[in-house]
Amino acid sequence: MKLIAASLRRLSLAVLTVLLVVSSFAVFTPSASAETYTVKLGSDKGLLVFEPAKLTIKPGDTVEFLNNKVPPHNVVFDAALNPAKSADLAKSLSHKQLLMSPGQSTSTTFPADAPAGEYTFYCEPHRGAGMVGKITVAG
């Protein structure tokens, strides 16, 4: 009887170890489907716009903001205009430091648990001129 109990314990331990190893791969493996998108800050013609002005992504995707024309620019996500209405989320996605030279860039990776919906962002120096964009996180 003791031999059977010892064998069952060893078998249980082996099964638990295998399950732990397999589940750790599922948890810690980065998403293979995560993509990077580029949004230009200023159009190629020098207009004060984001190109593209609207973008649809998935949670876990990265958006690179590339300073193109008519600097300075930055990227600020509106705290009131995101699905969670969260100032903390908006702050974590924003890049308030001004990009002064064409070719400079900054990037934002949307968290894997980012709420689905529309996120509005703008350039602080040029918001009044209509430099506003929207990113939709697909659910």
From Swiss-Prot:
One of its GO terms (molecular function) is copper ion binding. Its cofactor is Cu(2+). PROSITE patterns: COPPER_BLUE. It is found in: Cellular thylakoid membrane. Residues 1-34 form the signal peptide. Residues 35-139 form the Plastocyanin-like domain. One of its GO terms (cellular component) is plasma membrane-derived thylakoid membrane. InterPro entries: BlueCu_1, BlueCu_1_BS, Copper_blue_Plastocyanin, Cupredoxin, Plastocyanin, Plastocyanin_cyanobac. Keywords: Copper, Electron transport, Membrane, Metal-binding, Signal, Thylakoid, Transport. Its main location: membrane. This is Plastocyanin. It comes from Nostoc sp. (strain PCC 7120 / SAG 25.82 / UTEX 2576).
